[in-house]
């Protein structure tokens, strides 16, 4: 049964994450970035200053969570497993060149996340408690010209979002934590799973307000720890940095890798694994979306709150 499920998931991965979706994500991001005249990049310093002002931490009654809490809620999904496990798997499967495409998808994805967040704020509504609620499902339902089609698409998005929350939203993180604790401290994976479930339930039952309060204190600590850890790795391996950059650029732009050939776009063999420019792009962009969530619509849900 496990083998059958694995084959089914692999087949779905080949169909969904085909070349068409890779170019659709990058193409949409490039189109929006050019249409906005690089607004996400030009206004990034001003946006950061505004978010970290003292006023940004104060929520207004009836207007949802504060700007800073909204930011930390979104960052909670992007700092962590996606930037650690996602990067590692991208390199193993796609080679060093995958890191370039992960970085590029993150930069281009700024425009995608800006537009989806703006739309979600524009079409958000008030729930029964008088609190703002929004997301792509509300955009599809209220902004789509054909109302019936809009409602159907909204329901489909909500259903797929729930399914995604079990996979990339929970299982990947839970498995990474359980595996790390099991290997390092010999903690049983079942115990870790139960503890994570209980802690998650306590936070979720409080609604978006409780989630925002938890992330407001937790995410800054995560960010500092993550940046400190990556900084230490770079510092201790600084002499290998130039060679690493060369490998990343070569893996992403090697002409032989991008044009392909009888060898199936072979670039290099590392530890018995054949890497190619096409594989680097595929795994770099797909793991990049897992990390930055640009195009998934999740950013708009927290922004609308």
Regions found by a protein language model. Give the residues of each.
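N-terminal alpha-helical transmembrane segments of multi-pass membrane transport
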Residues: 1-81, 91-98, 109
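Hydrophobic alpha-helical transmembrane segments of multi-pass small-molecule transporters/permeases
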Residues: 11, 15, 26-33, 70-74, ...
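Membrane-interfacial loop-to-helix junctions in multi-pass transporters
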Residues: 17-22, 56-64, 96-97, 146-154, ...
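Helix-loop-helix module between adjacent transmembrane segments
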Residues: 28, 32-33, 105-130, 141-175, ...
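Membrane helical hairpin/interfacial module
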Residues: 88, 95-108, 115-116
């Amino acid at each position: 049964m496990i083998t059958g499920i694995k084959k089914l998931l692999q087949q779905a991965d080949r169909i969904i994450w085909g070349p068409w979706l890779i170019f659709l994500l990058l193409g949409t991001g490039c189109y929006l970035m050019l249409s906005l005249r690089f607004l996400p990049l030009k206004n990034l310093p001003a946006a950061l200053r505004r978010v970290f002002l003292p006023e940004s931490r104060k929520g207004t009654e009836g207007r949802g969570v504060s700007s800073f809490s909204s930011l930390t809620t979104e960052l909670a999904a992007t700092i962590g497993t996606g930037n650690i496990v996602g990067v590692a798997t991208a390199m193993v499967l796609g080679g060093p060149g995958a890191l370039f495409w992960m970085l590029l998808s993150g930069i281009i994805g700024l425009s995608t996340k800006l537009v989806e967040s703006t739309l979600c704020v524009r079409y958000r509504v008030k729930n029964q408690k008088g609190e703002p609620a929004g997301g792509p499902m509300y955009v599809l339902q209220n902004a789509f010209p054909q109302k019936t089609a809009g409602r159907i698409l909204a329901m489909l998005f909500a259903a797929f979002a729930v399914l995604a929350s079990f996979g990339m939203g929970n299982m990947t993180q839970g498995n990474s934590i359980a595996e790390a604790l099991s290997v390092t401290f010999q903690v049983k994976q079942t115990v870790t799973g139960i503890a994570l479930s209980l802690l998650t339930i306590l936070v979720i039952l409080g609604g978006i307000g409780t989630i925002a309060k938890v992330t407001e204190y937790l995410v800054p600590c995560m960010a500092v720890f993550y940046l400190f850890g990556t900084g230490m790795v770079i510092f201790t391996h600084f002499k290998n940095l130039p060679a690493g950059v060369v490998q990343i650029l070569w893996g992403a732009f090697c002409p032989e890798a991008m044009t392909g050939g009888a060898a199936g776009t072979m670039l290099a063999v590392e530890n018995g694994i054949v890497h190619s420019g096409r594989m680097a792009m595929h795994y770099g962009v797909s793991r990049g979306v897992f990390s930055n969530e640009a195009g998934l619509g999740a950013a708009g849900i927290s922004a609308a709150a």
